[in-house]
Amino acid sequence: MISRKSVITFGMVAIPIGMYTTTTDNDIRFNQLHKEDNSRIRYKKTCAHCGKEVKTEDIVKGYEYDDDKYVVITDEEIEKIKTEKEKSIQILHFAQLNQISPVYYEKTYQAVPETGGEKAFELLRSALMAEQKIAIGKTVMGTKDTLMAIIPREDGILISTMFYADDIKAIQKQYTKPEVNEQEFNMAKLLINSMDTPFDPSKYKDEYQERLRSLIETKISGKEIVAAEPESAGKVIDLMEALKASVEKAQKDKETA
């Protein structure tokens, strides 16, 4: 589903694009019910002044500039103050592909060229891939000046909205780094390499959501809920022994895969 249309601009080049959401929410949602009769809980929007219920079409946006004093702002007024530049994604500069910490990325979209923009789109994608660069751009989304990363892929371009530096919290708690001896370090590297396989997202499922869905189906059918088998905690052993045992298990798992 298309989220919005925009134009990527850099220099004198303009590339019309559609931005599509890349994820879907599959989480199970629960409704709030009245304990006595299992009826749905409803909420009403009411006016704080007169107490009347207010319909959606009668609700406007307002900014509180003083205690209980508001100025009403319409969507049309918000749209009017956007410049032509702000309606497009203006590329500000380019950076190394692996330079930006993942903590700055917020929401990701797939960019697809609109009719007439295919060649310029492919030129940007292939040039970014060849140079291993990403583009940093800016546009207005909603009521916010939004920073964006334009990320090349073999199969297209992704656009991620980004947090600003002052949106990111400083690391809340540091830790004292203990000494690691060479034998432990080498064994840890061996474990990492023994578990190294290409990333295949189709292999991973939300197993807890699957069990939750099974619980719901069991309750609907009136069957008894069976508790999951407890996993053995295992004994606390020496770090080196744990690393060795983990390497052996990983190697066996690879052989039987």
From Swiss-Prot:
Alphabetically, the GO molecular function entries are: double-stranded DNA binding
Ku domain mapped to chain residues: 9-184
For this protein, the record's InterPro entries field holds: Ku70/Ku80_beta-barrel_dom (IPR006164), Prok_Ku (IPR009187), SPOC-like_C_dom_sf (IPR016194)
Keyword Flavoprotein, does the record have it? no
Q: Which Pfam families match?
A: Ku
Keywords, in A-Z order: DNA damage, DNA recombination, DNA repair, DNA-binding
Q: Does the keyword DNA repair apply?
A: yes
In terms of superkingdom, the source organism counts as Bacteria
Q: Name one GO biological process term.
A: DNA recombination
Disulfide linkage: none
Sequence intervals crossing the membrane: none
The entry's family comment says: Belongs to the prokaryotic Ku family.
Annotated function:
With LigD forms a non-homologous end joining (NHEJ) DNA repair enzyme, which repairs dsDNA breaks with reduced fidelity. Binds linear dsDNA with 5'- and 3'- overhangs but not closed circular dsDNA nor ssDNA. Recruits and stimulates the ligase activity of LigD.
**Subunit structure of this entry?**
Homodimer. Interacts with LigD.
- What is the protein name stated in its UniProt record? Non-homologous end joining protein Ku
- Biological classification of the source: Bacteria, Bacillati, Bacillota, Clostridia, Lachnospirales
